[in-house]
Amino acid sequence: MRCGWMAGSSETVGIMDTADWYIGHGQVTVAPCVSIERSQIKSPDSGYGVFVDVDKLQEEECEAVELLRVPYGNVISVRTLMDWLSGRGDGYDASKDLIKTYLALFLEDTSNHRFVTETNMLILYLALMAILSERGYGFPDKFVIYLRDVLLQTRLLTPVLEVLTQEAGDAGAHYRNGPQEIFLSTLLQFISGAFMGCTRAVVLRVYAAVLSRCLEIPHETSPGSEDYTVSSSLVPILDFTNHSCEHRNAYFDVDRESGDVLLMLDVAACAGLGDRFEVFISYCPVEELVHFKHTYGFFPRASCGTQFWHMFLSDTWLKEERAPHGSGSLFQIYSELRVLPYIELALISGQVYVNDYCSSFPELLLPFVNIEALSDKESKLTALKGDQQLLAEAKTNFLSFLARYLDKLVANGPIRHSGPVCASLRDILLRELELSKRLRNTLQHGSAFLSSHMADTSPPYCPSPAPSPPYAYMYTSS
């Protein structure tokens, strides 16, 4: 699903007008078989979707059919915005100069350099553009229309937004995104200081909409090269396409000669879908449910493939747990070793397992084995990985801790959720409670480690999560 539904008739007209404008002005090329309508996903957050009418499909014998073509100049990314800012004499010089001035002011504070990622800078660019546009400064229609009718109309609730706008207690604090909270609060402070009377709502909406609508578009590193980098980009019209790893029947690609972004239909994946069907792409190659909630405001539907859940361990409870071979608490040891305490759970066919294939899993085991002769983390990890007896001991001690942790979590779940907690974090905690019950059942009836059930193949790689506020000192980039 694409989060951020457009509620009410005025928003509906606005979105359709936006699509018509981009298509009518040649900003996007659309195949005759394509239409943009309300998604058929049964959810209030499903928004719009891209549909294909098979009767109008002109190249059904091909392996892939081009559904949409968005010219490079109409893709909104840091790269294309910098290209636009570098030009002169198009009637927008005053607006460009102000954008550059405010960008320089933000980056003048060297502590803000840690926020420099493509996505964060895209948020800053577009927040400045939205505010200046409201104050009468001119910008090209392709930017103004997308800002006004898409980004600023997106309604989205995520933990970061709710924490910064509502009362948030300690419940669920270990599932908060520390780096993004720091970035957004810093951005709000900068904007309020730079623009008198600016409302937080504009910045918050731009932040949430950009984060949820960005796609990672590949770009070759040099002409003809097989190597490529990805760029966080907003792709008008193509970004109406909804997400599903399980039902994916299309993908986005780049025309190497023109740089245009393409939505391609995978014809083989459409067999049996009927005469008219909705198009789905994958926003990311793996589904980590906490990340999805933070980014898109929803949990993806259960999949027949592997999904992941990064179970963050409560810093409050870690302070109460003593390490088996030391006097310090688990929280103290993890902090000293700069280990982010989370367990990567693999969700497969309704079962929940501890993913001991995860690259960070050995770090999680360090407090559960006695390696006093070595002081630094890397030496301890090398010793642990190279000694099967040590590894087995660490896993056994870890499982004992995990059993106690799950018992406490299941027993105290309702109490933990009764305090002041925003709706998004409550959703995460309730899902955590459900998965904890299933994991505890797995632990009680056999091995909880994924390697015991998937000995021949390992699951796909899942990127590490961002640290929660108690571990924000570990943050170097978002």
Swiss-Prot record:
Gene Ontology process terms (BP): methylation
CDD domains per the UniProt record, alphabetical: SET_LSMT (cd10527)
GO cellular component terms, A-Z: cytosol
Region (SET-like): 199-299
Domain SET, chain residue ranges per copy: 32-284
Localization in the cell: Cytoplasm, Cytosol
Catalyzed chemical reaction(s): L-lysyl-[cytochrome c] + S-adenosyl-L-methionine = N(6)-methyl-L-lysyl-[cytochrome c] + S-adenosyl-L-homocysteine + H(+)
The keyword S-adenosyl-L-methionine is assigned to this record: yes
GO terms for MF: [cytochrome c]-lysine N-methyltransferase activity
Position of the signal peptide: none
SUPFAM superfamilies: SET domain (SSF82199)
Keywords annotated in UniProt: Cytoplasm, Methyltransferase, S-adenosyl-L-methionine, Transferase
UniProt keyword annotation of Ion transport present: no
Family of this protein: Belongs to the class V-like SAM-binding methyltransferase superfamily.
Cited function: Methyltransferase which mediates trimethylation of cytochrome c (CYC1).
Name this protein carries in UniProt: Cytochrome c lysine N-methyltransferase 1
